[in-house]
């Protein structure tokens, strides 16, 4: 009914106070046959004079029970699944338009509720209690109970609220809703949820009004939390609950009502984001969610993100929200393939800026780790992994228990679970008290270096680097174990893996520089000399991260081996200077003459690289190594092989690569001729051999823009 009795009374401009609580209650009890008297609960409001035009309205409120007593059974009662949205979302049957009797009675109940609340507007909490008493009396007169008609009352309010004027009528409607929610929060939530999907302006305002009422907002939030978890409810129920939570949590001060179940609510929202990310895109969900969107959320995922932001901000976690925005965490949370990365970023931000909730989160996570629901289990695993960065939180469980759980994940067939386990082992390695667990950590981390999934290899490299940062790190053991495993990763096809592997080598050299300075011929020295050529060539890597990581690692090697070549290394890295590279090769040939054949063999392999800058860099490096090598250092077979490969490279489609190969081939030919010259008696060799002319290479077209200014290097040194 459009506006109900309230709409008619407003049309006649009758004052809202025309009816009093006493008049209503006495009229109801008189029709029920009870003795008249004052209401038993709440303060006695001041008696107002009842105007004559109010009497027909009072009669209209109770007319259904007298005129058609049989129609009382047509009011729908709460079923066994009051929160189900299936029936609410079904289209209405076709046929001639009629106003159902149940809708008419809902309107009458809503009229009574609105009038009563308006009369009690000044009575505060006592007025709310009196509102409930009056509604109960009205229903008892018809042989019904209030708890059975909450759905009907809320539906009636939803029908009449759009036609109410701002001010006292609107406040009366909100008071009725609060009065019902105080005693019947679950029924009110279940009745409002169908109007939240799709979004409804009236329902949104009612959710916000419940949020502002500190007596009921906690109960309503709890019911929405259970609806969001929705283990037995359909999916639309969780979506509607997400939108309702977004409306309520956006109200200032509402987050305080979540005390006691804040971690539970946060995990439920993040898990809901995981479910939304894994489900097919709904029609209202954009393919790309933009953080700059303003106004109402454009999708269920963005609505959940806004609810999560409001939950964090309302509890003083504004820095968590800011960190997530700067790191792109919110965008990752809504992505199907990046959700767990977003969870890890959220956990890291909370460890840094919201540690007062970590204990509660950790306790709520533990039972979820064994959940049969994949989104819930994986989200809990990611949170568990991220929270291990907090030492006080990690101490809530025994070290052995955490380690056993993480190692168990390494045997899971799902790569994502193994990846999370490796990340957890990396966080565990940062704890200085885990020295005795190194022998257990290492096999799992080293074994992951052979995985095909880039996430697993990257996590293992990161964990090994963290392990090296610990005091008393097992440098010699790691050097021996990484000897056969690390060099292949320096040439991995994945940019991130190359950069991480080179960085791990640099960290290893920095931690073991004491033994290297003493000249110890251990596994670390062997590993560095084996990796020297890849590091020099990776200075020209198309990936900036890999190139910068190589430069940093070579600087660590220069410091540990006392080469005195830092200026040359920086000049080669940023200016691709042939003069600096020539000086560098001369020093290496003088320091390690026995390794020159290995250097040349390694460089020869890069002549077949699919990357143009690396092919040219390899040709140039061969030219300078051959130029500075003595004839007796290189055998004829190696020279022949180099000459053949450089000859094939002279037909390279890139002119710069072909030109460099031509110059280096000439150097190989000159070294071969010098090696083949007859030596003669020692006394007759008075005149020195003629010096071989140095190679001259053109400037590289692949040179990147230099950032050498931050190193304090003004430019290449010219001869």
Curated annotation (Swiss-Prot):
Pfam families on file: HEAT_Maestro, HEAT_MROH2B_C
Q: Which GO terms describe its cellular component?
A: cytoplasm
- What does the record list as coiled-coil region(s)? none
> InterPro entries annotated for this entry?
ARM-like (IPR011989), ARM-type_fold (IPR016024), HEAT_Maestro (IPR055406), Maestro-like_HEAT (IPR048465), Maestro_heat-like_prot (IPR045206)
- Per the UniProt entry, the signal peptide is none
Q: Name the keywords, alphabetized.
A: Repeat
- UniProt region (Disordered), positions on chain: 25-103
Recorded hits in Gene3D superfamilies, A to Z, give: Leucine-rich Repeat Variant
Q: Where are the HEAT repeats?
A: 356-393, 397-434, 436-473, 477-514, 527-563, 594-631, 633-674
Query: Sorted alphabetically, which PANTHER family does this protein's record hold?
Result: MAESTRO HEAT-LIKE REPEAT-CONTAINING PROTEIN FAMILY MEMBER 6 (PTHR23120:SF40), MAESTRO-RELATED HEAT DOMAIN-CONTAINING (PTHR23120)
Write the protein's name: Maestro heat-like repeat-containing protein family member 6
| Organism of origin | Homo sapiens
| Taxonomic lineage from the root | Eukaryota, Metazoa, Chordata, Craniata, Vertebrata
């Amino acid at each position: 009914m459009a506006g109900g009795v309230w709409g008619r009374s407003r049309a006649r401009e009758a004052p809202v106070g025309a009816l009093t609580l006493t008049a209503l209650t006495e009229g109801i009890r008189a029709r029920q046959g009870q003795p008249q008297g004052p209401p038993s609960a709440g303060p006695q409001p001041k008696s107002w004079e009842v105007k004559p035009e109010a009497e027909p309205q009072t009669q209209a409120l109770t007319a259904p029970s007298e005129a058609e007593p049989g129609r009382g059974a047509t009011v729908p009662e709460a079923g066994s699944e009051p929160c189900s949205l299936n029936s609410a979302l079904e289209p209405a049957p076709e046929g001639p338009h009629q106003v159902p009797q149940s809708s008419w009675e809902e309107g009458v109940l809503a009229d009574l509720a609105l009038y009563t609340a308006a009369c009690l507007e000044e009575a505060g909490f006592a007025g709310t209690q009196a509102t409930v008493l009056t509604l109960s009396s009205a229903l008892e007169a018809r042989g019904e109970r209030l708890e059975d008609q909450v759905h009907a009352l809320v539906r009636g309010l939803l029908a009449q609220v759009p036609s109410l004027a701002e001010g006292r009528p609107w406040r009366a409607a909100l008071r009725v809703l609060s009065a019902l929610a105080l005693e019947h929060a679950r029924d009110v939530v279940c009745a409002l949820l169908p109007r939240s999907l799709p979004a409804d302006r009236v329902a949104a305002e009612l959710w916000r009004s419940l949020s502002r009422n500190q007596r009921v907002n906690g109960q309503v939030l709890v019911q929405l939390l259970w609806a969001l978890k929705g283990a037995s409810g359909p999916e639309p129920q969780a979506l509607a609950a997400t939108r309702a939570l977004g409306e309520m949590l956006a109200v200032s001060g509402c987050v305080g009502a979540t005390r006691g179940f804040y971690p539970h609510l946060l995990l439920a929202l993040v898990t809901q984001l995981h479910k939304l990310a894994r489900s097919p895109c709904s029609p209202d969900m954009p393919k790309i969610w933009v953080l700059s969107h303003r106004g109402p959320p454009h999708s269920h995922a963005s609505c959940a993100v806004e609810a999560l932001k409001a939950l964090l901000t309302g509890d003083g976690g504004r820095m968590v929200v800011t960190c997530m925005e700067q790191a792109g965490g919110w965008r990752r949370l809504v992505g199907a393939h990046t959700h767990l990365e977003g969870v890890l970023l959220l956990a890291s931000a909370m460890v840094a800026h919201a540690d007062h909730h970590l204990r509660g989160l950790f306790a709520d996570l533990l039972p979820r780790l064994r959940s049969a629901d994949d989104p819930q289990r994986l989200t809990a695993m990611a949170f568990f992994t991220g929270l291990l960065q907090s030492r006080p939180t990690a101490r809530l469980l025994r070290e052995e228990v955490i380690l056993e759980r993480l190692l168990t994940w390494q045997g899971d067939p799902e790569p994502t679970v193994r990846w999370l386990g490796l990340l957890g082992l990396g966080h565990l390695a940062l704890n200085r008290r885990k020295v005795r667990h190194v022998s257990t950590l290492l096999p799992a981390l080293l074994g992951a270096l052979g995985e095909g999934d880039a996430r697993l290899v990257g996590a293992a490299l990161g964990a090994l680097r963290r392990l090296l940062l610990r005091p008393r790190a097992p440098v010699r053991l790691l050097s021996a174990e990484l000897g056969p495993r690390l060099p292949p990763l320096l040439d991995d096809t994945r940019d991130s893996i190359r950069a991480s592997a080179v960085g791990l080598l640099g960290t290893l050299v920095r931690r073991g520089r004491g033994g290297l300075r003493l000249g110890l011929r251990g596994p670390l020295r062997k590993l560095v000399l084996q990796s020297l050529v890849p590091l020099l060539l990776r200075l020209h890597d198309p990936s900036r991260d890999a190139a910068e990581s190589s430069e940093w690692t070579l600087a660590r090697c220069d410091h540990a081996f006392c080469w005195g070549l830092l200026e040359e290394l920086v000049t080669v890295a940023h200016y691709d200077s042939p003069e600096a590279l020539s000086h560098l090769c001369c020093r290496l040939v003088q320091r390690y003459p026995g390794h020159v054949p290995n250097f040349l063999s390694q460089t020869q392999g890069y002549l077949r690289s699919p990357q143009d800058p690396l092919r040219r860099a390899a040709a140039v490096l061969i030219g300078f190594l051959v130029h500075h090598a003595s004839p007796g250092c290189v055998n004829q077979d190696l020279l022949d092989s180099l000459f053949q490969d450089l000859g094939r490279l002279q037909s390279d489609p890139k002119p710069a690569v072909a030109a460099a190969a031509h110059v280096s081939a000439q150097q190989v030919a000159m070294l071969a001729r010098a090696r083949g010259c007859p030596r003669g008696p020692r006394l007759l060799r008075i005149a020195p051999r003629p010096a071989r002319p140095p190679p001259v290479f053109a400037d590289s077209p692949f040179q990147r823009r230099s950032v050498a200014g931050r190193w304090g290097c003004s430019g290449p040194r010219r001869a």
